[in-house]
Amino acid sequence: METAQTAPAPGSLSWKLSSHPITLLTFLFFRISSLLVYLLGMRLLSSNFVLIFIVTILLLAMDFYYLKNIAGRRLVGLRWWNEVDGATGDGRWVFESADPESREQNATDKRFFWMALYVQPVLWVVMAVVALFGFNFIWLTLVAIALVLTITNTLAFSRCDKFSQASGFASNAMYGSGLARNLAGGLVSNWFRR
């Protein structure tokens, strides 16, 4: 007796439904690998702290770069960066989002991205508590670096998503009702009446 194999529902947590499976799997690899190296190093190889520290920092840096520049753009259409004004030295964050009309978002990619983005800082906070209560203060330095990197990406992508939704709402409100067309038409006609 054969059973019919049902396909996973769209948006479910199956990498096979991803529009960019290699990007998704690489993203998940970097997200998970730094935590695993830290956990295994802290419990099994604690005598070689320097090696675990270096490998974990390298994995965190690769995760930060890959998430910021590749996974965010390909999986959810969001990107951010920091620009510094050369004259004043002031920095500002710049957020970029793909045009929602020209880019169809995959529900699976979106779900994996946001879940992994928010879960990892929580797991690093748990690691901080474990290191604190275990009196492993030297491991706490590594957790602090991990928290800075993961929280920076989490905050930046959250803001980027918020601004992309706000700009999408504003453009839909203006162009959808013809408000921008009427306003521009009125300004142009007033200009030529003078």
From Swiss-Prot:
Any one cellular-component term (Gene Ontology): Golgi membrane
Primary subcellular site in the record, as a coarse category: Golgi
Topology of the protein relative to the lipid bilayer: Multi-pass membrane protein
Annotated transmembrane regions: 22-42, 44-64, 112-134, 138-157
Cell compartments where the protein resides: Golgi apparatus membrane
A single GO BP: vesicle-mediated transport
Glycosylation sites (chain numbering): 106
The UniProt record lists the keyword Translocase: no
RNA-binding is among the record's keywords: no
Keywords, alphabetical: Glycoprotein, Golgi apparatus, Membrane, Transmembrane, Transmembrane helix
Pfam families: DUF846
General function of this protein: Golgi membrane protein involved in vesicular trafficking.
Similarity comment: family membership: Belongs to the TVP23 family.
Protein name: Golgi apparatus membrane protein TVP23
Organism of origin: Phaeosphaeria nodorum (strain SN15 / ATCC MYA-4574 / FGSC 10173) (Glume blotch fungus)
